[in-house]
Amino acid sequence: MKAMDNNQKDRIMNKFIYLLACTLFVSCQNNNKSSVTQMEVELDSMWCTRLMPGLGSGVTGGDGAISIDLKDGRNLFMWGDSFFGDVVDDKRSKDSKFVMGNTFTIINEKGELETLYSGDLKNPSAYILAEQDGDSPRWYWPGDGFVKDGILHLFMSKFRKVGEGSFGFEYMCCDYFRLDVKTMKIIDKMNIPAANQNGVHYGHAVMPYQNAIYIYGTKSDSTGAKAVVHVAKAELVDNKLANFVYWDGASWQADATKTAKLEGLQKNISEQFNVFSLNEKIVLVSQNRSGNAKEIYSYIADSPEGAFSHEKLLYTVDEPNFEKDSMMTYNTMVHPQYLSLIHIS
């Protein structure tokens, strides 16, 4: 994630949402020789038009694009930093409002939109607000989550401002929220202390699988360019996450400091990424964090803790005037609830 000024943000608004999960994978024969089916990844501009109409009272620009199936015919799309204000002929109105942190869009089966934020259109602010201490501004950027029996379980990462420029912010902690799906009101929240104990930014990919919930996060070096993935596992007790344990490379441990990186991921994984189950496999999709950030890769595993293998380059971002307009690309998102299964390798 990164905070950007308005000019940068306007240039890199989500023009496309990549529904990559529909065209990701190839099949493998039993002899371990790949039987490759060439599949073309297509850009999908329809969702941008549906989720971010240029006119109206909703979000017309933003990053994040993290989606969660609300299990009632609606889908939640969570944006990080975002814009409110009309866009006409690809130009943003002068009275557009910039919101730091998070805003939500809910789309129903009819394609109707509901936008969730605090304040009003003249002075909008983040939907889930971070408590302030009067020192430096603090905010939540959205992580990932899931729905179970009418409750949205949601992870949010708290940051604070520590300097100027696009990277003048600092990670503070991971908080776990529960919201009522019908009203989208917060029921309660709980801090995840493991994130501060072992340095893993938990909650940026979450996967319900069999009888457990797997909570993934990256741990980066001091430069932020190199990062590995760690995973925690929890149970639902009275529809609330409890009994957290952490993968140490061989078994699950109650001590969060025993965590170890997941094996087999050859690229530096982006701050936000995707993990989901598909055809009895576990799939991880990530944008390249360092090197060529335009590249989007997938990996597969037989279990949620890996090891992962079968690295595959899915797509390379090819946006017109990318360098000329000083665009940035990061944190690709997959939307498995819209998946049309083809093959997996």
Annotate the PLM regions.
Residues 26-27:
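C-terminal motif of bacterial Sec signal peptides marking the signal peptidase cleavage site
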Residues 63-70, 135-148, 200-211, 269-278, ...:
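Structural signature of eukaryotic scaffold interfaces centered on beta-propeller domains
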Residues 92-109, 168-182, 228-236, 297-303:
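Beta-propeller blade signature
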Residues 144-235:
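Long, hydrophobic, well-ordered secondary-structure blocks that form the structural core
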Residues 203, 207-302, 316:
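Active-site cradle of extracellular carbohydrate-active enzymes
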Residues 309-337:
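Conserved blade-ending motifs and adjacent loop-strand segments that build the rim/top face
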Residues 342-344:
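Conserved small/polar residues in nucleotide/adenosyl-binding loops
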